[in-house]
A protein has these predicted regions:
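Sec-dependent N-terminal signal peptides
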Residues: 4-13
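Conserved beta-strand elements of the Class I
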Residues: 24-26, 52, 80
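Hydrophobic residues at beta-strand termini and immediately following loops
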Residues: 26, 54, 161-163
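Residue-level detector of flexible, active-site-proximal loop/helix-junction positions
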Residues: 11, 30, 58, 126, ...
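Catalytic nucleophile-elbow at a beta strand-turn-alpha helix junction centered on a G-D-S/GDSL motif
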Residues: 21-36, 56-60
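Sec/Tat signal peptide C-region and signal peptidase I cleavage site
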Residues: 15-19
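Alpha-helical cap/lid subdomain in secreted, periplasmic
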Residues: 41-50, 63-185
Length: 185
């Protein structure tokens, strides 16, 4: 967990805290747990750095788009870190093709850019299975989505955080010492 925070810090520039947040973390349960001591997170990290955590457990990217105006644009942060898609792949709200997941990520990116908010895109974290949806085989869809996200970020000159590569086993699972359920670090 500390390595993930260190990676984020390395990407963000240092500035004095002020009224608007420096960064908004927009995502699902991966981010949701980062500022909760209940889940091993570090709420003081967010407070000390003027970051706002808008991770919502179980959400798909369409739900992230629906709240993007309120949670990101209205706060007018310097940047937004977007990490989502695993719940789409898990079919939490039904089947969602990868092209639609990517469309939602592009929509959030465009909304942020229209308001001069810097966008940092993240890969989907590795998972060999979803405990709540054992019939889903997520490895190939996650790898496919991560290629799409990386291509989009590179083509549009966006900052990009690859969580997948350092956290994945060669079989596409989240490394065991990092997780109790194989999905959440």
């Amino acid at each position: 967990m500390r390595k993930l925070f260190a990676l984020i810090i390395a990407i963000l520039y240092i500035s004095v805290a002020y009224a608007q947040p420096r960064a908004v973390f927009m995502g699902d349960s991966i981010f949701d747990s980062w500022d909760s001591t209940k889940h091993g997170g570090h709420p003081q990290f967010f407070k000390n750095n003027n970051f706002v955590n808008c991770g919502k457990s179980g959400e798909v990217t369409a739900q992230m788009v629906a709240r993007f105006q309120r949670d990101v644009i209205d706060r007018n942060p310097d940047c937004v870190i977007i990490c989502g898609g695993t719940n789409d792949i898990a079919q939490n709200k039904g089947y969602v093709p990868n092209r639609l997941i990517m469309k939602n990520i592009k929509t959030m990116t465009k909304m942020a850019e229209q308001h001069n908010i810097e966008v940092i895109l993240c890969t989907i974290l590795p998972a060999a299975r979803y405990p709540w949806r054992p019939e889903i085989e997520p490895v190939k869809p996650i790898r496919n989505m991560n290629r799409r996200i990386a291509r989009f970020a590179k083509h549009h000159h966006r900052k990009f955080i690859d969580f997948y590569t350092p956290l994945a086993t060669k079989h596409g699972a989240l490394q065991t010492p990092l997780s109790k359920d194989g999905v959440h670090p």
